[in-house]
Amino acid sequence: GGSHVWKVGGKVFAIGGWQDDEPSFTFKVTDISYEMLKGQPGLRPAPYLASRGMTWIQHFAKPGLSDDELKDYIRQSHHIVSRGLSKKKQVELGLIKRR
């Protein structure tokens, strides 16, 4: 409860909420980013999602990521998830142009 879920084409790309009075954000990353981020202070494999083999990271405490880094990772998450949509859905959403 109390979480905000952001989707593209019906697919989740980020989840925001609070944990111990700190903002918490969960987002999908590439395999390489997952390996780089998963052990950094303030970051961890996302509960539930990562345990199912998915490459999701949770930013849950300081120091974590800077605001700019967090925005970049959430943008990348949107891109990763939107690429997984059907071409028809991507065209519908204006993510790619019809050929």
Question: Model regions: which residues?
Answer:
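Charge-dense, helix-prone N-terminal extensions
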Residues: 1-99
